[in-house]
Amino acid sequence: MAQAVRNNKKKRKKRSQAPVALVYFITLLAFLGLIGLLALMIVDRLTNKEEAKVDFSNTYIDSFNTMYARVNDQNVLSDLCIVRICPEQAKILVVPVSAFTVSDTDGVSTFREVYESGGIRQLQTAVDKTFGIATDYYATVSNQAFEDCADIIGGFLYAPSEELYYISQTNDNDVSIRENEAVVLTGRQIRLICQYPVFSAGRQGNTEFLGTAITSLLNNAFDQVDLTTNSLDIMYKKVADKGATNLSENDYKEQKVYIKEMLNKKVQPTYSMIPEGQWTDDKHFTVSPEFKQKLYDEMEATKSQEKSGDVSEE
């Protein structure tokens, strides 16, 4: 009889532990679920960072420089452009650069030769040393990507101060525009004028035209807020998918936040500085110390003010 009572107590004791274990298991699941929900919210916030609204008055956003190097179908450097974006001041500085600029790394090689022997990273080093600046990002841009991006924006209206005429040896890539004739240039026409010897000033004329083209295209993009906002991803992919770049998708998303905010200001933020110096012949250009100082001063003037704060969302 006593043995039966003890057995009965053991059974009751075992049964009483089951609900405790069940409650513990449910609590554990709920805790894990809460952790998962918090993680999901954090990931979602980071993934949608590009849709955030930036409060520039309380946020430190440093300006950034990107070097775009246009290469032809034979992977030869055609020209390049330094683009500095200052979100805080809503300014974009464009510095067009000839591929025949002599690099300060050795005082002999041109940027085209530097790219041919060392690729885009060595070119970035040469550009930084030659102009006395620091570029944060680099990207190679194919002829097709350049034309496509220019066409998405819609080209730009151009009236040359001299007749531009050139008969191409291949593919009917001719250039023919009358003096003072206002025409809307397509991406292909812009590219051809950038690379062919159509200017009386020689290759300096090509560099100046490149500055005019990029400045006009970017300002046109800022005049078309909805079109540009909806096309940013497309243009990024055209450059990134087929080019060499250190601009990651996350870097691009962060930049897109600032660019969208600048677009909403409805301004034309872009201006250019044309490199000054000396052409010793048609294939060697040396940047003057005076221009390097001017560029340094402009870089200093377009630095962001150091402030504290975070990107805020509404």
Range-by-range predicted roles:
Residues 61-63, 75-80, 89-94, 122, ...:
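Extracytoplasmic
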Residues 117-179:
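Amphipathic, coiled-coil-like alpha-helical scaffolding segments used for oligomerization/assembly
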Residues 151-232:
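Flexible, polar/acidic helix-loop-strand segments at domain edges
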